Swiss-Prot record:
It comes from Pseudomonas putida (strain ATCC 47054 / DSM 6125 / CFBP 8728 / NCIMB 11950 / KT2440). It is found in: Cytoplasm. It catalyses: [[Fe-S] cluster scaffold protein carrying a second [4Fe-4S](2+) cluster] + N(6)-octanoyl-L-lysyl-[protein] + 2 oxidized [2Fe-2S]-[ferredoxin] + 2 S-adenosyl-L-methionine + 4 H(+) = [[Fe-S] cluster scaffold protein] + N(6)-[(R)-dihydrolipoyl]-L-lysyl-[protein] + 4 Fe(3+) + 2 hydrogen sulfide + 2 5'-deoxyadenosine + 2 L-methionine + 2 reduced [2Fe-2S]-[ferredoxin]. Residues 1-24 are annotated as: Disordered. InterPro entries: Aldolase_TIM, Elp3/MiaA/NifB-like_rSAM, LIAS_N, Lipoyl_synth, rSAM. Residues 96-313 form the Radical SAM core domain. Binds 2 [4Fe-4S] clusters per subunit. One cluster is coordinated with 3 cysteines and an exchangeable S-adenosyl-L-methionine. It holds the Pfam family Radical_SAM. This is Lipoyl synthase.
Length: 338
């Protein structure tokens, strides 16, 4: 049996006797990042000496433009968060310069501690009941035609935040009736049925939930989450709302093998997932999970070919692909084929 340490180097099981910093007491509204964030997860991450040098094909210039500044100012004005900023997405400049953004609702503090993710952890504050309306106004101001809404995990809420998603969708459609909406939802751990019942009443145009990695690496990369649960979430939504495309994605470079990626893709199709994104994992800091490999663009292209053979309606596969990158184009192609 493969141990977590064998699966991902630079990890030590928590029972290791090596002293580790005492976890900080988490107060409501305080955001923990880096070493403080991962202090209580089931594995200990040994900080890398330095971040790995990126190959030429993955380097990105972050453009500075008035449009980027305008969108950031608009987000601040309406007290909104974008996952583009919170997760340090490499495509932030391109998306913001194009006048688009992926909005992150329910605050910027997550109740999970996934050590690949750069979003802060802590005890979130109560939901902002004005957020759905503020979000709708911002989207109308930006005159967007396609919007992705995602969120932090909110394990403190009875429905995991599903009603808040539905409220946002309703307000946005009231002000921008022509907009298409994609939701990138958490796993609704322990509350799937109630969350999906709410979601089905106000469904998005695309329903997205990321598996993130292969099942062997879940304990290291997604503590508190379950691979089969996430697959079931996507399939059960599809059964409730069969006309809405479902979507999921993986990060590559955490220690998975190509064979494991192909196996996960097959499982996705068995669970009626229509759309797939595959991108390169980039280590946000020395305290996050280390990059085990940089996947070559040719390998990403091969995964895309295999995905279409399996029956995915759209496959976005490349080093800089992220779940919401060119999401409008992905959805357009997928719906044409549905």
């Amino acid at each position: 049996m493969t141990t977590v340490q064998e699966a991902v180097p630079n990890l030590i099981p928590t029972q290791d006797a090596t002293p580790r910093p005492a976890p900080k007491k988490v107060e409501a509204g305080v955001k923990l990042r880096g070493a403080d964030k991962v202090a209580r997860i089931p594995v200990k991450i040994i900080p890398t000496d330095e971040l790995p040098k990126k190959p030429d094909w993955i380097r990105v210039r972050i453009p500075v433009s008035p449009e980027v500044d305008r969108i950031k100012q608009l987000l601040r004005k309406h007290k909104l968060h974008s996952v583009c900023e919170e997760a340090s997405c490499p495509n932030l400049g391109e998306c913001f310069s194009g006048g688009t953004a992926t909005f992150m609702i329910m605050g910027d503090i997550c109740t999970r501690r996934c050590p690949f993710c750069d979003v802060g952890h802590g005890r979130p504050k109560p939901l902002d009941l004005d957020e759905p309306k503020n979000l709708a106004v911002a989207i109308a101001d930006l005159r967007l035609k396609y919007v992705v809404i995602t969120s932090v995990d909110r394990d403190d809420l009875r429905d995991g935040g599903a009603q808040h998603f539905a409220d946002c969708i309703r307000e946005i459609r009231a002000l921008s009736p022509g907009v298409q909406l994609e939701t990138l939802v958490p796993d609704y751990r322990g509350r799937m049925d109630v969350a999906l019942e709410i979601t089905a009443q106000e469904p998005p145009d695309v329903f997205n939930h990321n598996l993130e990695t292969v099942p062997r690496l879940y304990k290291a990369a997604r503590p508190g989450s379950d691979y089969d649960w996430s697959l079931d979430l996507l399939q059960k939504f599809k059964q409730l709302v069969p006309h809405v495309p479902t979507k999921s994605g993986l990060m590559l470079g955490l220690g998975e093998t190509d064979e494991e990626v192909i196996e996960v893709m097959h499982r996705m199709r068995e669970h009626d997932i229509d759309m797939l994104t595959l991108g390169q994992y980039l280590q946000p800091s020395r305290s996050h999970l280390p990059v085990q490999r940089f996947v070559h663009p040719d390998t990403f292209a091969w995964f895309a070919e295999e995905g279409y053979k399996m029956g995915f309606k759209n496959v976005a596969s490349g080093p800089l692909v992220r779940s919401s990158y060119h999401a409008d184009q992905q959805a357009h192609e997928a719906k044409i084929k549905l």
